[in-house]
Amino acid sequence: MPQYNKLQVEAIFGGTVIDHIPAQVGLKLLSLFKWLHTKERITMGLNLPSNQQKKKDLIKLENVLLNEDQANQLSIYAPLATVNQIKNYIVIKKQKLKLPKIINGILSCPNENCISKVELKAADFIVKIKLNKIYLKCKYCERDFDHKIVTKI
């Protein structure tokens, strides 16, 4: 594979870079994690060339630092992503993601009869793996859902 020696997306002075997001997932992450509501600059690369994945998405959040729990919640949709903290254009911390045990306050339960729908609030989910697939169990209605059908609030 050829080496790519030119930045496809402009570097940031400080903040967070989320790299190795599967292609076509970057916009979903922006929406799910409500980063579109920040007043800080967001730079994205979609369908960028990648040696590991053929194509990838990339998100750069200027002046935004994710804590470990926030970063690990990304692994539901981007398990191979890395989260890099940047300071003065230099990576000061690189985090490989781990699947969290619980996801709080981000996603909405797909069950129309769930009490979280009546209260118009985000549900809390317990993360489970069955047959190498990720499922989310709603803490309110106790139903399991494939992670791909659980949506933002």
Curated annotation (Swiss-Prot):
The cofactor required is:
Zn(2+)
GO BP terms:
'de novo' pyrimidine nucleobase biosynthetic process; pyrimidine nucleotide biosynthetic process
Secretion signal, residue range per the UniProt entry: none
Cellular component per GO, a single term? aspartate carbamoyltransferase complex
Q: Which GO terms describe its molecular function?
A: metal ion binding
Is the keyword Metal-binding in the record? yes
Provide the disulphide bond pattern.
none
Q: Which residues form a coiled coil?
A: none
Identify this protein by name. Answer: Aspartate carbamoyltransferase regulatory chain
Organism encoding this protein: Wigglesworthia glossinidia brevipalpis
